[in-house]
Structure formats: C-alpha cells, structure tokens
Regions:
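An alpha-helical appendage that flanks or caps ligand/catalytic pockets
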Residues: 108-155, 197-262
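Hydrophobic faces of well-ordered beta-strands that scaffold small-molecule active sites
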Residues: 3-7, 31-33, 57-60, 87-91, ...
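Short, acidic/polar
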Residues: 11-22, 75, 170-178
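Active-site-adjacent beta->alpha loops and helix N-cap segments on the catalytic face
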Residues: 39-46, 192-207
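Glycine-rich anion/phosphate-binding loops
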Residues: 65-78, 108
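N-terminal small/glycine-rich loop or linker at the start of catalytic domains
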Residues: 1-8, 58, 96-99, 138-163, ...
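N-terminal beta1-alpha1-beta2 module of alpha/beta enzyme domains
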Residues: 1-59, 65, 164
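Conserved, mostly hydrophobic/aromatic
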Residues: 27, 48, 79, 121, ...
C-alpha cells in the first residue's frame, strides 16, 4: 500500500509545496497535482521535483483534450528527468464543462482518445520515429489533412525510463475497461469499497482479461477523503461542499456519473 495526498487546485501552491516536503519526511509516497482550470499541473510538478527527494509526483489529472499526446509525453519525460524517475502521468477526459467551456475543444470520443494517447506516449518514450495512424491522431499528418511536409520524428532527449507510469482517471464502464486493459494505474473518484464491485467490477474484469500479461497488474489509487479535527458533524460539514460540487455541479444534469456513484 502507498499513501498519497491530493493538492488543492485553488490553494496557495508555495505553501502546499512546503507541506508536501514535510509530509515526505513523515512517509508520504505520492502527491497528486490537479489542474482543472487553475494553474497548469506541470509547472507545479517541476517545482515539487526540486523540493522533494523520494516521493512520486503525479498529475491528477491532465485532460487529454488540452494537449497533444506527444506534448503529454514530452512533459512527463521532462518532469521524470527533473525528478530522477519519480513522475507519474495522470490523464483523463475531464468533462465538457471544462473541455468545451474553458479550452474550447469539442468533447468527443473520450475513451478512444485516451487509448490512442497511451499508445502514442509509450512510443515517444521509446524514442521511436513516430508514425501513428489512429482514428483520432495521425503522425505525421497526411497530405489530405495538412501540408504533407510532416516528418516522422523521435524524441531528442533520452528519457530517464523507457516508460513513465500512466494512471487514468476513469468512471464510466467503457473507460474503466480500457484503463484495466492498458494503463498502469486507475484513479477512481470517491471510491467506496462496499459499492465498488457493483459499479466497476464487470468493467475491471473485462479489461483485465485483455491486458498484456507482460505488464504489471493494475495499481488502484482508491483514495478517500480524510478530515482531521474535533467533532464528527463538524468534519462532515467540511466534506459536504466538495461532494456537493461533484454530485451537483460536475457533469450535465441528465448525465452525471458522480451522482451514480453516490
């Protein structure tokens, strides 16, 4: 078991980084750096790489719609270099409220895009000349979609590792199945052990059946909220706004997987 913590995307980062450095001394194993529509995660991850020595620095998460797969791979390789092999690339689809509302990009085919992103990232880290013909991504871009002058290039720098671990934030059945098949880790939101099998069990088993046996078993980062303080009701009151944000504010009214979890 590894112990991790998630930074707030709305708090003061310098103060949080100091706290993370102290938590590392106490035994913290992983720190998740969120992004949403706040400051970008990689800037904070690079800063944490300089302020820590041992713990894993994970993006939690970067949307696949806000960057090309190759830029995600380049960024993860850069943070991995700065941290001497301590980066974990956490990716996900986010949601249409952020992707279309903040980035102005159509929220289309999230499962397929994440699948192709994983495949492309691993090719980049192996420093292959990148030639990829997917449904959503094409490298080099063909003449009928671009100028036809694109070249198959490989990453200039040598990454610290042949692969940076990829963790996927997934909630829907198809996304969870794809994660269990391809990813190194799974980051579910509001994981409730007593209901996990009913919600995700079938998808996890279906994905595991297609998983490459040479790849290590899927690591599950099933964190729960922990409040430290006096009085049970007071701590519940502290948790209510965050839960209400996701249950009531994230996702459309008619299609909200967070609501299904609860």
């Amino acid at each position: 078991m590894r112990i991790s913590t998630l930074l707030s995307y709305a708090g003061g980062f310098r103060e949080a980084a100091e706290e993370v450095a102290e938590l590392e001394k106490a035994g913290l194993d992983v720190v998740w750096v969120p992004e949403a529509y706040s400051f970008d995660a990689p800037s904070a991850m690079g800063y944490l790489a300089a302020r820590t020595e041992r713990l894993t620095i994970a993006s939690g998460i970067m949307p696949v719609y806000s960057r090309t797969p190759t830029l995600l791979a380049m960024t993860a390789a850069g943070v991995d270099y700065l941290s001497d092999g301590r980066c974990m690339l956490g990716i996900g689809a986010s949601g249409p409220q952020v992707v279309e509302g903040f980035h102005g990009v159509p929220y289309q085919a999230p499962v397929g895009r994440i699948r192709e992103t994983i495949e492309i990232c691993r090719r980049v880290w192996r420093r292959e000349k990148l030639e990829y013909q997917g449904k959503y991504y094409e490298m080099p871009l063909s003449a009928n979609r671009g100028t036809g002058l694109g070249k198959a290039l490989k990453l200039i720098n040598h990454p610290v590792r042949d692969e940076v671990p990829i963790t996927v934030a997934a909630l829907g059945p198809k996304s969870v199945e794809m994660t269990a098949e391809l990813a190194d880790g799974w980051l579910p939101a509001f994981y409730l052990p007593e209901g996990a099998d009913a919600i995700w069990g079938e998808a996890l088993r279906a994905g595991a059946a297609k998983r490459d046996p040479a790849r290590a078993p899927l690591e599950v980062f099933s964190g729960g909220a922990v409040a430290i303080g006096e009085g049970l009701e007071a701590q519940r009151d502290r948790a209510r706004p965050q839960i209400a944000l996701y249950v009531g504010g994230m996702g459309a009214k008619e299609k909200n997987f967070y609501n299904r979890i609860f």
